[in-house]
């Protein structure tokens, strides 16, 4: 054993350059493999963050057409038939699913009419009628004012909450709290401004990335109590469900389970 080690060391010493180049090749090879693995892992993480956002683990379950793979749009396709509201029992079934931390029901109109404040007009906002669990489920924080309280729903108060983008675009730095805006001929008092804790900012490297990740972005969001939604939009929009999963890995499973429950009603 010792003789073999001695002969090996003599061979290395006698061919120092060849031994050095061999060791260098091995080191470079290992470093290249580590670099490739790190690059692939980093790319996968970036794609995952682009597709699902970073940090809030929220899955949105929406009504899709069965013949085409896109979200149902009542503006182009009319009122869907046979879609019933989510009742209390079904909502509780959603909350009881494994890996579900919270859930909220909401209605949404993506291509809404313009929003007015005085002589200012803002187009392109998304309007949502939300329940009392929406802001906690989707990880919104209050920047100014407050969120909805039970009396806002029970008394059908004409109030609205803006996200920070809408507040900035419409009020240009002016404090919006207590101000009256107009939507669909209805006066709404702004009671709060909210921000998402983990805002989705995808990395855009190409035109294809832009269309993939930015096609559904709007000028901002306006939130209304779901109790007053019928007075502005009737009952046209089907309910959607926002579900916060326990972790990123559970999002796909949670989304599928919620969709299955909704399809069974």
Each language-model region and where it sits:
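Residues that line or immediately flank small-molecule/substrate-binding pockets and catalytic motifs
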Residues: 24, 107, 183
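N-terminal Sec/SRP start-transfer signal
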Residues: 1-30
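Mid-to-C-terminal secondary-structure elements
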Residues: 133-147, 158-265
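Amphipathic alpha-helical segments that mediate coupling or scaffolding at interfaces
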Residues: 8-11, 26, 46, 50, ...
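Hydrophobic, regular-secondary-structure patches
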Residues: 41-126, 169, 230-233, 249, ...
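Hydrophobic alpha-helical membrane-associated segments
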Residues: 28-35, 39
């Amino acid at each position: 054993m010792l003789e073999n080690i001695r002969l090996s060391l003599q061979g290395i010493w006698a061919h120092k350059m060849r031994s050095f180049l061999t060791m260098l090749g091995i080191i470079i090879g290992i470093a290249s493999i580590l670099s490739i693995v790190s690059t692939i892992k980093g790319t996968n993480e970036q794609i995952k963050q682009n597709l699902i956002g970073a940090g809030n683990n929220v899955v949105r379950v929406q009504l899709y057409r069965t013949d085409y793979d896109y979200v149902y749009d009542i503006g182009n396709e009319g009122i869907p038939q046979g879609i019933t509201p989510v009742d209390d029992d079904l909502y509780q079934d959603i909350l009881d699913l494994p890996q579900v931390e919270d859930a909220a029901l909401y209605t949404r109109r993506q291509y809404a009419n313009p929003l007015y404040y005085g002589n200012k007009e803002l187009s392109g906002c998304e309007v949502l009628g939300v329940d009392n669990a929406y802001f906690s489920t989707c990880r919104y924080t209050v920047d100014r004012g407050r969120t909805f309280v039970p009396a806002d729903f029970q008394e059908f108060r004409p109030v609205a909450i803006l996200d920070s983008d809408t507040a900035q675009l419409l009020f240009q730095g002016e404090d919006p709290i207590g101000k009256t805006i107009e939507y669909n001929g209805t006066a709404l008092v702004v009671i709060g401004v909210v921000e998402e804790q983990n805002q989705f900012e995808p990395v855009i490297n190409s035109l294809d990335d832009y269309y993939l990740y930015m096609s559904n972005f709007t000028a901002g969001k306006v939130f209304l109590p779901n109790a007053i939604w019928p007075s502005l939009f009737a009952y046209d929009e089907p309910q959607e469900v926002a579900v916060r999963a326990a972790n990123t890995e559970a999002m796909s499973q949670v989304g599928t389970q919620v969709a299955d429950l909704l399809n069974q009603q």
